Amino acid sequence: TCNTINAWCNENTDGLIPEIMKPDMLNENSELCLTNSLYFESGWSQDPWDVSDEKEKFGDNEETKYMTSIGDNYYENDAATAFEKYYANNLSFIGILPKAEGDFTLDELDIEGLLESEPEYDEVNCKMPKLNFETTAELSDILSRIGLENVFSDDADFSGIADKAVHVSSVLQKTKLELDENGTKAAAVTAVTMECMSAMDTDPIIKDVELTRPFAFLIYDSANEEVLFMGKVLTVQ
Protein backbone atom coordinates (compact mmCIF):
# COMPACT_ATOMS: atom_id res chain seq x y z
CA THR A 1 0.00 0.00 0.00
CA CYS A 2 2.76 2.45 0.93
CA ASN A 3 4.60 1.75 -2.34
CA THR A 4 1.38 2.27 -4.31
CA ILE A 5 0.77 5.66 -2.69
CA ASN A 6 4.35 6.78 -3.29
CA ALA A 7 4.29 5.61 -6.92
CA TRP A 8 1.16 7.72 -7.49
CA CYS A 9 2.85 10.66 -5.78
CA ASN A 10 5.97 10.32 -7.94
CA GLU A 11 3.97 10.05 -11.18
CA ASN A 12 1.69 13.01 -10.47
CA THR A 13 4.53 15.39 -9.54
CA ASP A 14 6.79 14.38 -12.45
CA GLY A 15 9.29 12.96 -9.96
CA LEU A 16 9.60 16.18 -7.95
CA ILE A 17 8.09 14.49 -4.86
CA PRO A 18 8.89 10.76 -5.17
CA GLU A 19 7.66 9.82 -1.69
CA ILE A 20 5.21 11.03 0.94
CA MET A 21 4.47 7.93 3.03
CA LYS A 22 6.75 5.75 5.17
CA PRO A 23 5.71 2.17 6.01
CA ASP A 24 5.40 2.98 9.73
CA MET A 25 2.77 5.65 8.95
CA LEU A 26 0.21 2.91 8.23
CA ASN A 27 -1.01 0.23 10.62
CA GLU A 28 -3.68 -2.46 10.92
CA ASN A 29 -6.32 0.21 11.62
CA SER A 30 -5.52 2.22 8.46
CA GLU A 31 -8.59 2.01 6.24
CA LEU A 32 -8.19 4.76 3.62
CA CYS A 33 -5.53 7.15 2.37
CA LEU A 34 -6.84 10.02 0.26
CA THR A 35 -4.19 11.86 -1.76
CA ASN A 36 -4.19 14.87 -4.04
CA SER A 37 -1.43 16.71 -5.83
CA LEU A 38 -0.65 20.07 -7.40
CA TYR A 39 2.14 20.39 -9.98
CA PHE A 40 3.43 23.56 -11.62
CA GLU A 41 6.21 24.10 -14.16
CA SER A 42 6.87 27.19 -16.27
CA GLY A 43 9.57 29.38 -17.72
CA TRP A 44 9.60 33.16 -17.36
CA SER A 45 7.61 35.34 -19.74
CA GLN A 46 10.18 38.04 -20.55
CA ASP A 47 13.11 40.06 -19.16
CA PRO A 48 15.33 37.13 -18.14
CA TRP A 49 17.21 37.03 -14.87
CA ASP A 50 20.92 37.84 -14.67
CA VAL A 51 22.85 35.66 -12.23
CA SER A 52 25.72 37.10 -10.23
CA ASP A 53 29.06 35.30 -10.03
CA GLU A 54 29.76 36.69 -6.58
CA LYS A 55 28.11 35.77 -3.31
CA GLU A 56 26.47 38.49 -1.23
CA LYS A 57 24.94 38.56 2.21
CA PHE A 58 21.50 37.14 2.94
CA GLY A 59 20.29 38.32 6.31
CA ASP A 60 23.01 38.69 8.92
CA ASN A 61 24.87 35.39 8.76
CA GLU A 62 24.55 33.80 5.32
CA GLU A 63 25.85 34.34 1.80
CA THR A 64 24.37 33.37 -1.56
CA LYS A 65 24.41 34.28 -5.26
CA TYR A 66 21.57 36.49 -6.47
CA MET A 67 19.50 36.89 -9.61
CA THR A 68 18.45 40.36 -10.82
CA SER A 69 15.83 41.42 -13.35
CA ILE A 70 13.12 43.95 -14.17
CA GLY A 71 9.77 43.12 -12.59
CA ASP A 72 6.36 43.45 -14.20
CA ASN A 73 4.45 45.02 -11.28
CA TYR A 74 5.18 46.69 -7.96
CA TYR A 75 3.06 46.61 -4.80
CA GLU A 76 3.40 48.36 -1.44
CA ASN A 77 1.48 48.69 1.81
CA ASP A 78 2.42 49.67 5.35
CA ALA A 79 3.94 46.25 6.05
CA ALA A 80 5.79 45.25 2.87
CA THR A 81 6.95 45.95 -0.66
CA ALA A 82 6.67 43.38 -3.45
CA PHE A 83 7.49 42.72 -7.08
CA GLU A 84 5.54 40.55 -9.50
CA LYS A 85 7.21 38.72 -12.37
CA TYR A 86 5.18 36.88 -14.98
CA TYR A 87 5.57 33.29 -16.05
CA ALA A 88 4.82 32.19 -19.60
CA ASN A 89 1.37 30.83 -18.73
CA ASN A 90 -0.59 33.74 -17.19
CA LEU A 91 0.64 32.92 -13.69
CA SER A 92 3.19 34.95 -11.76
CA PHE A 93 5.76 34.90 -8.99
CA ILE A 94 5.39 37.56 -6.31
CA GLY A 95 8.33 38.25 -4.01
CA ILE A 96 7.36 40.05 -0.80
CA LEU A 97 9.85 41.89 1.43
CA PRO A 98 8.62 42.87 4.91
CA LYS A 99 9.52 46.42 5.88
CA ALA A 100 10.44 45.25 9.37
CA GLU A 101 13.52 43.05 9.59
CA GLY A 102 13.48 39.72 11.42
CA ASP A 103 10.92 36.96 11.62
CA PHE A 104 7.34 37.62 10.56
CA THR A 105 4.01 35.95 9.95
CA LEU A 106 2.17 35.99 6.63
CA ASP A 107 -0.86 37.54 8.34
CA GLU A 108 1.23 40.55 9.36
CA LEU A 109 1.92 41.35 5.70
CA ASP A 110 -1.78 41.79 4.76
CA ILE A 111 -1.15 40.08 1.44
CA GLU A 112 -4.69 40.68 0.16
CA GLY A 113 -4.36 44.41 0.77
CA LEU A 114 -0.85 44.39 -0.67
CA LEU A 115 -2.03 42.95 -3.99
CA GLU A 116 -4.81 45.54 -4.17
CA SER A 117 -2.39 48.45 -3.71
CA GLU A 118 -1.72 50.81 -6.60
CA PRO A 119 1.48 52.68 -5.78
CA GLU A 120 2.96 55.14 -8.25
CA TYR A 121 6.01 53.75 -10.07
CA ASP A 122 7.57 53.47 -13.51
CA GLU A 123 9.90 50.52 -13.11
CA VAL A 124 10.75 47.94 -10.47
CA ASN A 125 14.16 46.34 -10.12
CA CYS A 126 14.03 42.96 -8.43
CA LYS A 127 16.69 40.83 -6.80
CA MET A 128 16.39 37.42 -5.19
CA PRO A 129 18.28 34.17 -4.56
CA LYS A 130 17.63 30.95 -6.40
CA LEU A 131 15.33 28.67 -4.41
CA ASN A 132 15.47 24.91 -3.94
CA PHE A 133 13.71 23.51 -0.89
CA GLU A 134 11.37 20.84 0.39
CA THR A 135 9.04 21.00 3.39
CA THR A 136 6.89 18.44 5.15
CA ALA A 137 4.08 19.41 7.52
CA GLU A 138 1.52 17.53 9.61
CA LEU A 139 -1.65 19.62 9.33
CA SER A 140 -4.01 17.92 11.80
CA ASP A 141 -3.55 20.47 14.60
CA ILE A 142 -3.86 23.42 12.22
CA LEU A 143 -7.06 22.06 10.66
CA SER A 144 -8.53 21.39 14.11
CA ARG A 145 -7.82 24.97 15.19
CA ILE A 146 -9.67 26.42 12.19
CA GLY A 147 -12.81 24.43 12.90
CA LEU A 148 -12.44 20.94 11.40
CA GLU A 149 -12.44 19.08 14.71
CA ASN A 150 -15.22 16.65 13.77
CA VAL A 151 -13.27 14.84 11.04
CA PHE A 152 -10.71 13.74 13.65
CA SER A 153 -13.29 12.52 16.18
CA ASP A 154 -15.75 9.65 16.54
CA ASP A 155 -18.42 12.05 15.22
CA ALA A 156 -16.85 12.01 11.75
CA ASP A 157 -19.18 10.89 8.96
CA PHE A 158 -17.48 9.51 5.86
CA SER A 159 -20.28 7.12 4.94
CA GLY A 160 -20.18 8.44 1.38
CA ILE A 161 -16.69 7.07 0.74
CA ALA A 162 -16.15 4.32 3.33
CA ASP A 163 -18.10 1.20 4.27
CA LYS A 164 -16.80 1.27 7.84
CA ALA A 165 -16.94 4.02 10.44
CA VAL A 166 -13.68 5.94 10.03
CA HIS A 167 -12.11 9.21 11.09
CA VAL A 168 -9.07 11.17 9.94
CA SER A 169 -5.92 10.19 11.81
CA SER A 170 -3.37 12.35 9.97
CA VAL A 171 -3.09 14.98 7.24
CA LEU A 172 0.42 15.10 5.79
CA GLN A 173 1.54 17.64 3.19
CA LYS A 174 4.87 17.70 1.36
CA THR A 175 5.93 20.59 -0.87
CA LYS A 176 8.95 20.96 -3.18
CA LEU A 177 9.95 24.11 -5.07
CA GLU A 178 12.81 24.83 -7.45
CA LEU A 179 13.24 28.36 -8.84
CA ASP A 180 16.12 29.69 -10.94
CA GLU A 181 16.82 31.95 -13.90
CA ASN A 182 15.14 29.49 -16.28
CA GLY A 183 11.80 29.14 -14.49
CA THR A 184 10.06 27.36 -11.65
CA LYS A 185 8.98 23.85 -10.76
CA ALA A 186 6.71 23.38 -7.77
CA ALA A 187 4.66 20.49 -6.44
CA ALA A 188 2.56 19.71 -3.39
CA VAL A 189 1.05 16.41 -2.29
CA THR A 190 -1.42 15.98 0.57
CA ALA A 191 -2.16 12.58 2.09
CA VAL A 192 -5.18 12.18 4.38
CA THR A 193 -5.05 8.91 6.32
CA MET A 194 -8.25 7.51 7.85
CA GLU A 195 -8.49 4.86 10.54
CA CYS A 196 -11.30 2.69 11.72
CA MET A 197 -12.80 4.15 14.87
CA SER A 198 -11.11 2.56 17.74
CA ALA A 199 -8.44 5.20 18.41
CA MET A 200 3.03 63.02 -15.10
CA ASP A 201 6.43 64.43 -17.04
CA THR A 202 8.68 63.90 -14.12
CA ASP A 203 11.72 61.84 -13.38
CA PRO A 204 10.85 58.14 -13.60
CA ILE A 205 9.93 56.50 -10.31
CA ILE A 206 12.21 53.50 -9.91
CA LYS A 207 11.40 51.02 -7.16
CA ASP A 208 13.78 48.36 -5.84
CA VAL A 209 12.69 45.16 -4.12
CA GLU A 210 15.73 43.20 -3.00
CA LEU A 211 15.02 39.90 -1.27
CA THR A 212 18.31 39.86 0.61
CA ARG A 213 16.82 38.91 3.98
CA PRO A 214 13.87 36.73 5.08
CA PHE A 215 10.95 37.18 2.69
CA ALA A 216 7.65 35.68 1.57
CA PHE A 217 6.55 34.57 -1.87
CA LEU A 218 3.47 33.56 -3.83
CA ILE A 219 2.85 31.71 -7.06
CA TYR A 220 -0.32 33.48 -8.07
CA ASP A 221 -3.11 32.99 -10.60
CA SER A 222 -4.31 36.56 -11.13
CA ALA A 223 -7.07 35.59 -13.58
CA ASN A 224 -8.81 33.54 -10.88
CA GLU A 225 -7.33 35.45 -7.91
CA GLU A 226 -6.00 32.21 -6.45
CA VAL A 227 -2.77 31.55 -4.56
CA LEU A 228 -1.31 28.25 -5.79
CA PHE A 229 1.76 28.22 -3.54
CA MET A 230 2.70 30.44 -0.61
CA GLY A 231 5.74 30.36 1.64
CA LYS A 232 8.41 32.08 3.71
CA VAL A 233 12.15 31.92 3.05
CA LEU A 234 14.10 32.39 6.28
CA THR A 235 17.38 30.78 5.19
CA VAL A 236 19.17 30.03 1.92
CA GLN A 237 21.13 27.08 3.32
Task: Set out the residue ranges of the language-model regions.
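Short beta-strands and strand-coil junctions in structured, solvent-facing domains, enriched
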Residues: L16, G102-D103, V227
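Gram-negative host-targeted secretion-system effectors, predominantly Type III and Type IV
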Residues: T105-E108
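Non-catalytic, conformational "gating/processing" segments within enzyme and secreted inhibitor domains
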Residues: T1-K99, S117-T202
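Extended hydrophobic
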Residues: L34, T81-I96, D201-Q237
